[in-house]
């Protein structure tokens, strides 16, 4: 295979992974190959597919359902681990079992709590403020501490989540429902209202679109979409030079990041100044920090970061999980009926669910766990990174290795969850008399160890109140594909992205009764 063929193969595969500009001409090619041939550690790394010269396992990285393909490889080879070599000497270590993920990401968290560093993201896009992607260290700890202090136990979060769910119910009265757009709006409504006191009116709202654009950019970069992150010397390519188009893209996305971080925060500051700021996490924080000293200004800067990250995070995984809920209910009417019966038994059809019911309807708790288990929003999690060489089970894990926990595989382990792991069955989390059993819940859908998602409580709250509110008042029926035919479960292919979700399908949201309609129409008056 000659040089031109290798470059063609590289470009073909990278373009499938979402690369924006892959021209490697002239000096770009020289830089690339100088870096590729720089070599890496020659040691006994964990098992994996046989690598190619130069490209490593780049062509082995699947573009559809990688979580299933990695799981099959590990099971076929009786291994908890799978190692993929990348060009330039680095590699990806897939952890396919709970034992491997716990051993490394929890028990050895001092080694495996870093995130891979992206030149595109941090240096060129200027998004080092995203604390979920920061290196493990003092800055990350300060941000996480502030997040917990301001978000955990905040009355604003649950109040706005409940109101957003009830606004969704009123939109579902419309016969021309596009549930995916409505779930997008509901999630944005909940998070923007809770963080900034901003209530978006439609899915075309400025802040909703801003979050969508930036989340899309983050997904491309985090998915390894730019050669500059594999070949760092490419950062010196001028913008005007062939192959330098990634810098123009970085400039555009950098502007989105600046806007997302500053505009809504300054909007709340203006509202506070004129006395019109509604209750939100931002208004509560700013009201308590009106001094203008160095310590307060640093806290305000950190707060800008975590507020922006909160609404960016919700624009991704939470939407996908709500779409999975819709799909599961449409495909499993018997499960839907059992969940509705459990809600009816608790509420007697007299009111809508609220957070006083949270934890008091065991079937709904089981349903929530099953939604997160059946298809987690991030099937391969977010990459961790090793901060030094380590040895595990006799294998070298080199410093800088990308660590990918196969969350989907762990939550589909037949030894834990039963042989019917591909079925949607909330009862797997319940005893025969309807109480919680000892099967592990689906908390790992939110991550592992010190890098577990800080917004997981907010995510669970949003999923619970939204799904319970819909089930109390609507039947989800008649799922059909884009050709109008009954939806075939075997044809469903989740997106291969940082926040995975099912393809769109049409379905009907039908009011359960006249009494349910009255609850929907009066819901916001009761909030």
Curated annotation (Swiss-Prot):
A Pfam family hit: p450
Coiled-coil residues: none
Entries under PANTHER family matching the protein: P450, PUTATIVE (EUROFUNG)-RELATED, P450, PUTATIVE (EUROFUNG)-RELATED-RELATED
Pathway(s) annotated for this protein in UniProt: Secondary metabolite biosynthesis
Names of the cofactor(s): heme
One Gene Ontology cellular component annotation held by this UniProt entry: membrane
Assigned EC number: 1.-.-.-
Record-linked InterPro entries: Cyt_P450, Cyt_P450_CS, Cyt_P450_E_grp-I, Cyt_P450_sf, Cytochrome_P450_fung
Binding-site positions, heme: 453
Protein's name in the database: Cytochrome P450 monooxyhenase eriA
Enzyme class at the top of the EC tree: oxidoreductase
Keywords for the protein's UniProt record, in alphabetical order: Glycoprotein, Heme, Iron, Membrane, Metal-binding, Monooxygenase, Oxidoreductase, Transmembrane, Transmembrane helix
Transmembrane regions: 17-37
Organism: Hericium erinaceus
The reaction(s) this protein catalyses: cyathadiol + reduced [NADPH--hemoprotein reductase] + O2 = cyathatriol + oxidized [NADPH--hemoprotein reductase] + H2O + H(+)
GO molecular function, one term: iron ion binding
Subcellular localization, as worded in the UniProt entry: Membrane
Membrane-protein topology: Single-pass membrane protein
Induction of the gene: Expression is induced under erinacine P-producing conditions.
């Amino acid at each position: 295979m000659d040089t031109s063929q290798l470059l063609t193969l590289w470009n073909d595969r990278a373009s499938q992974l979402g690369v924006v500009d892959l021209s490697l001409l002239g000096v770009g090619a020289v830089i690339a190959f100088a870096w590729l041939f720089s070599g890496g550690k020659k040691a006994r790394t964990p098992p994996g597919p046989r690598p190619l010269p130069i490209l490593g396992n780049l062509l082995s990285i699947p573009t559809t359902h990688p979580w299933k393909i990695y799981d099959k490889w590990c099971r076929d080879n009786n291994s908890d681990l799978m190692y993929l070599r990348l060009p330039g000497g680095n590699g990806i270590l897939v952890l396919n079992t709970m034992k491997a993920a716990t051993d490394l990401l929890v028990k050895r968290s001092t080694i495996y709590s870093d995130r891979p560093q992206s030149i595109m993201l941090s240096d060129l896009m200027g998004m080092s403020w995203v604390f979920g992607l920061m290196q493990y260290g003092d800055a990350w700890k300060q941000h996480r501490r502030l997040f917990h202090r301001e978000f955990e136990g905040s009355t604003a979060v649950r109040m706005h989540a409940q109101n957003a769910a009830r606004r969704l119910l009123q939109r579902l009265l419309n016969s021309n429902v596009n549930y995916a757009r409505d779930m997008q709006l509901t999630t944005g409504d909940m998070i923007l209202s809770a963080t900034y006191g901003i209530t978006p009116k439609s899915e075309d709202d400025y802040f909703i679109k801003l979050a969508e654009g930036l989340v899309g950019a983050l997904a491309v970069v985090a998915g390894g979409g730019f050669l500059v992150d594999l070949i760092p010397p490419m950062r010196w390519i001028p913008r005007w030079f062939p192959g330098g188009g990634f810098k123009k893209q970085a400039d555009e996305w950098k502007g989105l990041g600046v806007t997302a971080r500053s505009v809504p925060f300054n909007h709340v500051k203006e509202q506070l100044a004129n006395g019109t700021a509604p209750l939100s996490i931002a208004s509560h924080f700013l009201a308590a920090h009106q001094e203008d000293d160095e310590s307060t200004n640093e806290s305000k800067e950190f707060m800008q970061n975590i507020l922006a990250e909160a609404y960016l995070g919700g624009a991704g995984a939470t939407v996908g999980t709500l779409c999975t809920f819709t799909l599961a209910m449409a495909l499993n009417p018997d499960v839907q009926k059992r969940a509705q019966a459990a809600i009816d038994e608790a509420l007697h059809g007299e009111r809508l669910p609220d957070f006083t019911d949270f934890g008091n309807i065991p079937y709904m708790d089981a349903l929530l766990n099953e939604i997160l288990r059946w298809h987690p929003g991030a099937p391969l999690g977010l990459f961790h990174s090793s901060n030094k060489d380590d040895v595990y089970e006799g294998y070298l894990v080199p410093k800088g290795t990308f660590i990918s926990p196969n969350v989907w595989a762990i939550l589909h382990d037949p030894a834990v969850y039963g042989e019917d792991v591909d079925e949607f069955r909330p009862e797997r989390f319940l005893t025969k008399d309807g109480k919680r059993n000892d099967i592990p819940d689906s908390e790992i859908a939110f991550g592992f160890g010190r890098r577990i998602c800080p917004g997981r409580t907010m995510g669970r709250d949003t999923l619970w109140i939204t799904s319970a509110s819909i089930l109390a008042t609507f039947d989800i029926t008649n799922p059909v594909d884009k050709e109008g035919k009954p939806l075939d479960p075997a044809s469903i292919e989740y997106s291969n992205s940082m926040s995975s979700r099912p393809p769109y399908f049409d379905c009907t949201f039908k009011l359960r009764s006249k009494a349910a309609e009255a609850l929907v129409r009066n819901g916001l008056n009761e909030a």
